[in-house]
Amino acid sequence: MMAAGAAVALALWLLLPAVGVGEAGPPPIQDGEFTFLLPAGRKQCFYQSAPANASLETEYQVIGGAGLDVDFTLESPQGVLLVSESRKADGVHTVEPTEAGDYRLCFDNSFSTISEKLVFFELIFDSFQDEEEVEGWAEAVEPEEMLDVKMEDIKESIETMRTRLERSIQMLTLLRAFEARDRNLQEDNLERVNFWSAANVAVLLLVAVLQVCTLKRFFHDKRPVPT
């Protein structure tokens, strides 16, 4: 079962660096998700750059491995410990506002000496749109009094739709993670049921053979027959 989990763990890191166009500046922030295999007795950390005055939401879930638990820590770019959890199956944490720099996320499986863990986590950024960009876009259109529908209403509707679509994508991603965890758990239970069922059948057959042999010994008379 964990071999299948290892195949899932080969998912590509989706937080790809963006290339700026025009004037040099920091790349735009991007949401991302990642699934990886955490070996027994190991600790693995990830670093994610974040701009200042934004919102960072971190969601993680253990979807494979005995116990379905892991230790989790989140540190700020200044090295301040923001979140520390022990032996948790999942968690959701929000940092707001963020500091400019690299945040450190660590998953620790040191307490387990045998079982590896399949871990999924997602990073969700949210920041206010650049006011200059919004004003420049608004100046490029005709005055509001010349339109049947106010531009402010259109912008509000588009922003609401964008937010809902992004949240829908995030919820679907989490549902996929829940489905993967439940499937792995069911496969583990199926293996246990099959193993113990086969063991019970073997014991029943052994008992039946012993009973037959015992009954044969009762009816087998080795005394000589007088002639």
UniProtKB/Swiss-Prot annotation:
Location(s), subcellular: Cell membrane; Endoplasmic reticulum membrane; Golgi apparatus, cis-Golgi network membrane; Endoplasmic reticulum-Golgi intermediate compartment membrane
Segments carrying motif COPI vesicle coat-binding: 218-227
Keyword presence, Cell inner membrane: no
Cytoplasmic side: 216-227
Major location category of this protein: membrane
Membrane topology, as annotated: Single-pass type I membrane protein
Residues of the GOLD domain: 43-125
Keyword annotations: Cell membrane, Coiled coil, Endoplasmic reticulum, Golgi apparatus, Membrane, Protein transport, Signal, Transmembrane, Transmembrane helix, Transport
Intervals, Extracellular compartment: 25-194
Parts of the chain that traverse the membrane: 195-215
Coiled-coil positions: 145-170
GO CC terms in record: endoplasmic reticulum membrane; endoplasmic reticulum-Golgi intermediate compartment membrane; Golgi apparatus; plasma membrane
Subunit structure comment from the entry: Homodimer in endoplasmic reticulum, endoplasmic reticulum-Golgi intermediate compartment and cis-Golgi network. Interacts with IL1RL1. Interacts with RNF26; this interaction is important to modulate innate immune signaling through the cGAS-STING pathway.
Protein family according to the UniProt entry: Belongs to the EMP24/GP25L family.
Its biological purpose: Potential role in vesicular protein trafficking, mainly in the early secretory pathway. May act as a cargo receptor at the lumenal side for incorporation of secretory cargo molecules into transport vesicles and may be involved in vesicle coat formation at the cytoplasmic side. Plays a positive role in IL-33-mediated IL-8 and IL-6 production by interacting with interleukin-33 receptor IL1RL1. Plays also a role in the modulation of innate immune signaling through the cGAS-STING pathway by interacting with RNF26.
Protein name (database record): Transmembrane emp24 domain-containing protein 1
Natural source organism: Mus musculus
Name of the encoding gene: Tmed1
